[in-house]
Each structure stands twice: as C-alpha cells, then as structure tokens.
From Swiss-Prot:
SMART domains: NADH_4Fe-4S. NCBIfam families: nuoF_fam, PRK13596.1. Pfam families: Complex1_51K, NADH_4Fe-4S, SLBB_2. This is NADH-quinone oxidoreductase subunit F. Binds 1 FMN. Binds 1 [4Fe-4S] cluster. It is an enzyme of class 7 (translocase). The lineage of its organism: Bacteria, Pseudomonadati, Pseudomonadota, Alphaproteobacteria, Rickettsiales. The gene is nuoF. It comes from Rickettsia typhi (strain ATCC VR-144 / Wilmington).
C-alpha cells in the first residue's frame, strides 16, 4: 500500500485549484533550474535508475527510450506527449490534464531538455474540451512566468510547448498515427523501421511519451531514483494511477504502488464488488485491449509481469469489473464493435477481420451458431494478432481470446440452449 507522503498526484480529485500558484504550493516548479543544471545525461540516467516504464500500455523503459535520441542531430528534435486517451475503461490522463497540468508541463520541459528538443507538442483527445482549456490556461501561466519559452526557468534552454487537439480517432493514440495527424495527414500508422527516434515528426528525431510517464519525472528527479525504485516491485517500480469502473460500489481513480493485489485495490478504494466479492464474474485489468480474467485469477498483483503470467496485461491500468449479472459474451462483442469502428482500414487483417469477428461474436451472443465457429473465431484472432502494422489488430483479438479461454463453456451452453428454445 502506498504511503500518503509518497503520492505524486496530490490533486488527482481536483480538490484544489489547478492554477500555477496552487501547483507551486504542491511542490511543482520547485528549483526546476537546478534540475536542468545537472545536465541531460544525469536526467536520463536518473530516469533509467528509477525503473520508470511507460504508463501508456507498452511498459517500455522511459529512460531507455530517451537515450535512443541522437545527441548532436543536424535536424531539430521533438517531444510529443500522447494525451489522446481513448481506451475504453481508461481515464487517468484526463485527471492529470485537468487537475495537475503543471506537473505535465514541468515534465515536458525536463524531458525536452533531456532529449535536446526545443519544441514539444501535447496531442490531446478532441473530446477533451475542458481538459484542453485547463491545459492551455496552465501553459499561458507558465509562459507568462518565464517557466517555458525562451530561456525557460532561466536555464538558457529554449522550450516551446504547443497544445494540439485531435479529432476523435482512437487510432491516433498509436504513436506513428499520432505523428501523421500532427502533420495534418490522415491518422494512419507508419511501418517501422524507421522508428520515431530516427525519423519521427516532420522526418526529424522524435520521442513520444504518455501523459503519466512525463508527469512523474519532476518528482522522480527531486526525490531521487532510489525513492521511486523502492516503491512497487523489481522491474515494476513506482506508483501508477488505476481507473476502477464497472460493477463496484465506488468507481474511482486511485494512485497506488505497482504490484498491489487487484482484490485489495478494488475492496480498499472502490468499495468492493457490487454484491460482494463472491458476486464477481470477471475483470478486465488494463483497459479494453487486454484479455479478461475470471474470478479465480482476480487476486493477481497489478504489475506488468504478474499480469502477463496469468495471460493478460497491465495496459493502461483501466480496471473494468463485471459481476454475475453481466452477459460476458455480449460485453466482449461490444468491444469487438468498438475496434471494428476504430480500425483505420490500412491493413487487410484488421480492416476485414475486425468486422468479421464482430459479426461472429453477435452470432455467439444470440446462440445462433455452431460450436465449431468458436474454434474458427479463435483461429482468426490468431491470424490477425501480430499481422498488422500497429497493435490495434492485437487489441481487437485479445479480448476475444480471453473470453474463449475462460468462458468457452458459457458460449457452448448458449449455443445449446438456442437449439432447445
């Protein structure tokens, strides 16, 4: 359990103002120049030592990603912050954007300095109107106070931060599709290689990080890499914002230590499962794109490695709780429809496969199918998985794979009952 003094996002619930004055009282912008004066290598090394892994879903080492940027590039370098939070069940970045914007802005300055980027773009989800308004006001305050812009914080480093609003496409949360959108093109993922660190925004070296990944950096540097690394578990260090929704008594966002047991997280902060733990049917532990877990596996620890061991993933940390009243087959079919709708259509397996999977899922929902179709559906998900430019194909396949893995009997029972009816 995370100690109160170890929490990074003190204003996660918006109980205080998000303005600069209040943010400074919470410790933001304290001695930022001194942090920058320690140099780029020190900053990257500290972030590496902290063990910070990307909080957007992939879990890649943040410090390692920064180190891929060229040190003496002839082209300008860019930092891009992915604030296009559109994953069903996920709303952590939204609260940072509207209640803790200065943590993000300060993190942008430090990260930009570390990778040698004089320009940073925050790409924010189009539907986040109020969040974008709060963010822009915070940016204006930071410019007025000389915290960013020319000679940011008196460091001699110039850093401009721009807010760019998206237009509502889930696919633009994929880093290269986001870059295409920023350039004014249709948001469609790029083939890799080349990777963004070598050929990113406008063909220049670019680092793309999640909102939460960037927002925790100033606190890590102030309190030390060893402090952050001591929280959580080895290889799964630090704090994480978890979003708990669905059939719980008190849906909430909560910052906790990595590795906290899923059951403890739900019972301590979300008031428990509606109707008690015995009424639990399944949980999606990391946003809509990771496989669900049946009740028998729901006491797993919430970190990248533990969830991978049980056949799921931490993803974004968006926990969706489903009790026994849930039509689990329809719940996953609804996710299939989402991915069908959000496919950009570039890759044939995803373009054709997501629609096909949804149609078969609806047959299974009604029970109007043959048992052999279950195996056919599973085989098709495996043909889509890993055969697309981006991970949307994987994201569409995994929920169905999880359903068949853990609730195959229920699907077969529905098919059997349809014939009887």
């Amino acid at each position: 359990m995370l100690k109160e003094e170890d929490k990074i996002f003190i204003n996660l619930y918006g109980q205080q103002s998000y303005d600069l004055k209040s943010s400074k009282k919470r410790g933001d912008w304290y001695n930022t120049k001194a942090l920058l004066d320690k140099g780029r290598d020190f900053i990257i090394d500290e972030v590496k030592k902290s063990g910070l892994r990307g909080r957007g879903g992939a879990g890649f080492s943040t410090g390692m990603k920064w180190s891929f940027m060229p040190k003496n590039s002839e082209k300008p370098c860019y930092l891009v912050v992915n604030a296009d939070e559109s994953e069903p069940g996920t709303c952590k970045d939204r609260d940072i954007l509207r209640f803790e914007p200065h943590k993000l802005i300060e993190g942008c300055l430090i990260a930009s300095f570390a990778i040698g980027a004089n320009n940073c773009y925050i790409y924010i989800r189009g539907e986040f109107y109020n969040e974008a308004s709060n963010m822009q006001r915070a940016l204006d305050e930071a410019y007025t106070e000389g915290l960013i812009g020319k000679n940011a914080c008196g460091s001699g480093f110039d850093c401009n931060i721009y807010l760019h609003r998206g237009a509502g496409a889930y696919i633009c949360g994929e880093e290269t599709a986001l870059l295409e959108s920023l350039e004014g093109k249709k948001g469609m993922p790029r083939l890799k290689p080349p990777f963004p660190a070598g050929f990113g925004l406008y063909g220049c070296p670019t680092t793309i990080n999640n909102v939460e990944s960037i927002a925790v950096v100033p606190t890590i540097l102030r309190r030390g890499a060893s402090w952050f690394a001591a929280i959580g578990k080895p290889n799964n260090t630090g704090t994480k914002i978890f979003c708990i929704s669905g059939h719980v008594n008190k849906p909430c966002n909560i910052e906790e230590a990595m590795g906290i047991p899923l059951k403890e997280l739900i019972e301590k902060y979300a008031g428990g499962v509606r109707g008690g733990w015995d009424n639990l049917k399944a949980i999606i532990p990391g946003g809509a794109s990771v496989p669900l877990l049946p009740k028998s596996l729901c006491e797993v620890e919430m970190d990248f490695d533990s969830l991978r061991t049980v056949g799921s993933g931490l993803g974004t940390g968006g926990i969706i709780v489903m009790d026994r009243s849930t039509d689990i087959i329809y719940a996953i079919a609804r996710l299939s429809k989402f991915y069908m709708h959000e496919s950009c259509g570039q890759c044939t397996p995803c373009r054709e496969g997501t629609g096909w999977m949804w149609r078969v899922m609806m047959r299974l929902v009604n029970g109007n199918a043959k048992k052999t179709e279950i195996e056919t559906l599973l085989n098709v998900t495996k043909e889509i998985e890993g055969h697309t430019i981006c991970a949307l194909g994987d994201a569409a396949a995994w929920p169905i794979q999880g359903l068949i893995r853990h609730f195959r009997d229920e699907i077969e029972e529905r098919i059997k009952n349809f014939g009887i009816a």
